[in-house]
């Protein structure tokens, strides 16, 4: 069980004295701390542990057009160099992410989020990009255009 009182007492009260802001393909982030995609779910999993707004951003887990259960277990194996995983892109699908995850995320995370779109055909990528593009708010289209074109 999470000790919310301990967490609340240990949250940073002030912004850092140094300017840690960075530009990621034209998108300004307060700092360069961005958990890797797939390690942070859709953000909700970590919000009881600390104020995730201290992050510069995060990349939500790989999201496909259709919901995917992922690979059968076991999905993780130890090896000499560490571990290997093959989760298999388990996710609720882009429409569920837009309808459920993003509105929930908006209630507690107030910074840019990086979408990780996955697919098995050009048409699936196009569908996901078109759907997620409707959710994006930019002051100019340049960050999206540069990111997609690379």
Spans of model-derived segments:
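N-terminal capping/small domains of soluble enzymes
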Residues: 2-112, 119-120
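Aromatic side chains
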Residues: 40-42, 125, 138
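Conserved small/polar residues in nucleotide/adenosyl-binding loops
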Residues: 138-145
């Amino acid at each position: 069980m999470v000790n919310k009182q301990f967490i609340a007492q240990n949250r940073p009260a002030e912004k850092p004295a140094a300017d840690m802001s960075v530009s990621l393909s034209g998108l300004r982030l307060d700092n360069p701390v961005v958990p890797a995609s797939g390690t942070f779910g859709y953000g909700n999993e970590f919000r009881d542990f600390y104020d995730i707004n201290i992050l510069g951003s995060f990349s939500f887990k790989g999201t496909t057009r259709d919901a995917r259960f992922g690979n059968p277990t076991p999905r993780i194996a130890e090896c000499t160099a560490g571990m290997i995983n093959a989760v298999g892109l388990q996710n609720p699908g882009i429409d569920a992410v837009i309808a459920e995850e993003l509105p929930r995320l908006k209630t507690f995370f107030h910074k840019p989020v990086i979408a990780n779109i996955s697919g098995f055909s050009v048409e699936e990528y196009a569908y996901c990009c078109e759907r997620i593009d409707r959710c994006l708010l930019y002051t100019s289209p340049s960050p999206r255009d540069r990111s997609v074109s690379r």
